[in-house]
Amino acid sequence: MDCEIRPAHEQDADAISRLIIAALQTSNAQDYPAAVIAQVRQNFSPHAVRQLLSKRQVWVAQAAGEIVGTASLDGQVVRSVFVAPERQGQGVGRQLMAELERQALSAGITQLTVPSSITAEGFYANLGFRTLREQYHGEERTLIMQRELDQTTHNL
């Protein structure tokens, strides 16, 4: 599925929040207890998303006028990559990651790190990320993954 990848705007916050919460409740809920999902969900209220928009570089994937994915870059750290549950497996996440990589390379960043959920571990591994270590926040298990960027082969 080809999407338009564009920078997120403040007026996208509600749609981004809905998308992330739907992905958490549908996809991530298969790998994490309900209490963890409820805790993580609080980080993505419309208000919280608006705050993130002022702190990070956030992009959205849009198809037919609808936001179907989001991802952000915080320096060299990839954060909050989510795709609408009904669009997962259609290349939306890969397109978002390609844009993050382009942005990182243009900023002189040569390595990306991602604190991955166990749900997304396979996705990142398929993009060439390798697991460095595990990290726990209470019951939430996160995998710290990393990938070297290559200026000549930056199309995922």
Region locations from a protein language model:
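Conserved acetyl-CoA-binding loop-helix of GNAT-fold acetyltransferases
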Residues: G89-R102, N126
